[in-house]
Swiss-Prot record:
Highest classification ranks of the organism: Bacteria, Pseudomonadati, Pseudomonadota, Gammaproteobacteria, Enterobacterales
Molecular function terms, GO-annotated: DNA binding; DNA-directed DNA polymerase activity
The protein's name in its UniProt record: Uncharacterized protein YibT
Record-level GO BP terms: DNA replication
InterPro entries (UniProt xref): PolIII_theta_sf
Name of the gene: yibT
Source superkingdom: Bacteria
Length: 69
């Protein structure tokens, strides 16, 4: 039987990943300018994960024209 709160770190990591993906996708749609700062909602210990995932999703959502360039 799992302990209460045992999965909290995993849930935080998933939320941070989702936030990074959402930011990169909004940038891709030109809804927001690129931002390289970590939102205040992200715990400080998860900041490196956020920035790493943001860069990953930016590469993933990059328009095809930029890939050929």
């Amino acid at each position: 039987m799992a302990k209460i709160g045992e999965n909290v770190p995993l849930l935080i990591d998933k939320a941070v990943d989702f936030m990074a993906s959402s930011q990169a996708f909004r940038e891709y749609l030109n809804k927001t300018p690129p931002r390289d700062y970590v939102p205040s909602e992200v715990p400080s210990e998860s900041a490196p994960i956020y920035l790493q995932r943001l860069e990953y999703y930016r590469r993933l959502y990059r328009p095809k024209e930029e890939e050929r360039g």
